[in-house]
Amino acid sequence: REKRPDAVILVGTPTWSQEIDKAAESPLEDKNVMYTLHFYAGTHKDDLRNRLESYAQNGLPIFVSEFGMCDASGNGANDFESTTKWLDLLNKYQISFMCWNLANKDESSSVFRANSTKISDWTEEDLSEAGQWIKAYFKNRSYQ
């Protein structure tokens, strides 16, 4: 805090950053703290969404520092319907989020296909199913 008093500090929460209720019960005494939440749309559904909404409505500063469109293993089928519900909720409360994972590992959570070896100038063919979906999501979103 001495060097950067206005810097935001992201604080993880228990159980893979899903228990934001623990942060709400005993928040840190600092003006620039946000509590992290992780979700995987194929696994985490209404229960975690409802918990997030409850604490967001009460002003808990939340940042989704990891989310995937598949199940919590990082692999398995993508659930784009659940992903859409999640992102709609995050946008409703202006909660920032980061997609997992920017990799070419042969898993459904990877944004790139396993055979993509580029480090820039990616094409649609370099993107996995998840990568194509998230690209289309941001491309088609209206920004205010």
Where are these regions (language model features)?
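Extracellular glycoside hydrolase catalytic/binding regions
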Residues: R1-S96, W100, S109-Y143
